[in-house]
A protein has these predicted regions:
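Acidic, divalent-metal-binding catalytic cores of TOPRIM
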Residues: 73-350
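Loop/turn-to-beta-strand initiation segments
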Residues: 23-25, 55-61
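Catalytic acidic motif of RecA-like/P-loop NTPases
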Residues: 3, 30-36, 67
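Conserved helix-loop functional segments at active or binding sites
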Residues: 11-19, 50-54, 141-144
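Conserved D-loop-proximal element of ABC-family nucleotide-binding domains
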Residues: 21, 34-38, 42, 72
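H-loop/switch region of ABC-family ATPase nucleotide-binding domains
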Residues: 63-65
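GG-anchored amphipathic helix commonly corresponding to the ABC/SMC/Rad50 NBD signature/C-loop
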Residues: 1-29
Length: 350
């Protein structure tokens, strides 16, 4: 690694001096990150960029599999080489449909971990930490482990999916550099100006009369409809939960005890009270509503509940070979999102 650095410095130093009859210099480097730790990778990248800025007659073209370098170079300097239907394509991200503002947002957002999406065959974008913790476990339960299918899961910490969807799509082509799924909430009943609005102050032990009717008759949010319309093709697909992630999980009867166990792990006093109230209710929708409202009202511990549920599901996955009486059921919209970015196993529908 150090020998390569010395050699690269010598070559670029030589190029920086103008020579008679030579007007342009192109420096081609294959995987300069080889044998270098991340800090040195960043150092050599800055060295390249500084030389290019100081000497207009030098152009550096390098190939790389390093998320460290990709995260620092800037989206407009990235050319993706990808394969689709047994053909190779080149996609300069500068040609994407991203606005300058969206490019700036992505450059600030794409750290070393998230930049791994550029090397993936498939990408799943999620809203927050709960989904980021649990989706990999759900994928294992349906025999689609994400690592086996080269799928990267990206937590965008919000609902600003549009720049990512636009970046994935290659302008003028019906393909993208990867298949992508967006898993998000449809956020119905969130508009204060609509009669179906559900107050943010509502908790699980309040009077819930009429709330289920609001959810049943509520319409997906404008934000959800916008991202669904932007996707609308086979490159990036949007998969939405009815209301929220937690509510959708709890709508499956098998999942109630799993969720209550996870909640009781995090809330040893309040959890049993919730369990008693949920178990006394006959309506599956009301059970799901209580669980969602409980988690929503204690938002600061959502990640802890997800971690507790993740540990429970890991045990279920390990015990699957012995048979599980009431296995956790992955909601259909999440299964569809995972299937979208993974190849179906031969002869297996689910």
């Amino acid at each position: 690694g150090y020998n390569n650095l010395l050699f690269i410095s010598a070559v670029l130093g030589d190029m920086s001096f103008e020579k008679s009859g030579i007007y342009e210099n192109v420096f081609l480097v294959e995987e300069p990150e080889a044998h270098l730790h991340p800090q040195l990778q960043e150092l050599i990248l800055n060295f390249f960029m500084k030389n290019v800025q100081q000497h207009e007659n030098i152009q550096v073209i390098m190939t790389s599999h390093s998320p460290t370098m990709v995260s620092k170079i800037g989206t407009k300097n990235i050319n993706l080489i990808y394969e689709s239907q047994h053909k190779l394509y080149n996609y300069p991200l500068v040609n994407s449909s991203l606005t300058d503002e969206e490019n700036d947002y992505l450059e600030k957002y794409l750290d070393v971990t998230k930049s791994q999406l550029f090397f993936a065959k498939g990408v799943i974008f999620v809203e927050g930490i709960s989904e980021a913790i649990l989706i990999p476990e759900f994928a294992k339960l349906i025999n689609r482990p994400l690592d086996m299918y080269a799928v990267e899961l990206v937590n965008i910490n919000g609902v600003g999916f549009a720049p990512f969807a636009k970046m994935i799509k290659v302008p003028g082509k019906s393909s993208g550099f990867a298949k992508a799924s967006i898993i998000t909430d449809d956020d119905r009943c969130s508009n204060k100006n609509e009669p179906t609005y559900i107050s943010k102050d509502l908790d699980y032990d309040d009077d819930l009369t009429g709330i289920i009717d609001k959810i049943d008759h509520g319409t997906p949010s404008t934000r959800f409809n916008s991202i669904t319309a932007l996707c609308g093709d086979n490159v990036v697909k949007c998969f939405g939960a009815v209301k929220t992630f937690e509510y959708a999980l709890a709508l499956e009867p098998n999942n109630i005890e799993y969720l209550l166990d996870a909640i009781s792990t995090v809330y040893p006093e309040a959890g049993p009270k919730l369990r008693k109230k949920v178990n006394a209710e006959a309506s599956q929708q009301l059970k799901a509503l209580m669980i969602w409202l409980f988690v929503r009202s204690r938002n600061s511990a959502k990640a802890q509940v997800a971690q507790a549920l993740g540990r429970i599901l890991q045990k279920q996955h390990q015990d699957d070979k012995n048979g599980v009486t009431s296995p956790f059921v992955v909601p259909k919209y999440i299964k569809d999102a995972i299937y979208n970015v993974t190849r179906r196993l031969s002869g297996a529908e689910e």
